[in-house]
């Protein structure tokens, strides 16, 4: 059992090292897209399922409240956080549309959709991205494995941050770290002297 525990830590560290080599440019581009949207008076919509939903909510909470330092609130909405809306849509047997309907209702040109999917194949996330495209929104996709269907939907101005792993747990761990990096970059770009 102890060796298995050490193996989990070792694999996580190795994935973090691989991500540190592969992802800085993509994370930087994503942060700049998010910052530019906020500077233009737009908002960030985010969504995910399971652990990805928790990461989406963490991102939105860090924007609305704060990340590590006090600063003005920033507009972000976790589309998976409103149980009444979610159950109303799924009650009508529209499971695949649970986020797309919200994107069509709330999304505007210039907004960003932060779509988080471990494999990139969740139908409701794919439909949300398709809806965001019709609204002229920028998409930041956090994926893993081979990027899945999401990777094929992204345009030139969109950003995919694909965790270099084929293990769901490692992808999810690095998604959380990536969300924290994005929050840190947004805060330090928009409010560079808040930490002084």
UniProtKB/Swiss-Prot annotation:
Free-text function comment from the UniProt entry: Required for the timely initiation of chromosomal replication via direct interactions with the DnaA initiator protein.
One annotated Gene Ontology cellular component of this protein: DnaA-DiaA complex
GO molecular function: carbohydrate derivative binding
Keyword line: DNA replication
InterPro entries in UniProt: DiaA, GmhA/DiaA, SIS_dom, SIS_dom_sf, SIS_GmhA/DiaA_subfam
Gene Ontology BP annotations: carbohydrate derivative metabolic process; DNA replication; positive regulation of DNA-templated DNA replication initiation
Protein name, UniProt field: DnaA initiator-associating protein DiaA
NCBIfam families to which the protein is assigned, alphabetical: PRK10886.1
Subunit structure: Homotetramer; dimer of dimers.
Occurrences of domain SIS (ranges): 34-196
Cross-referenced Pfam families: SIS_2 (PF13580)
Family in the record: Belongs to the SIS family. DiaA subfamily.
Domain of life: Bacteria
Keyword Transport assigned: no
Organism: Yersinia pestis
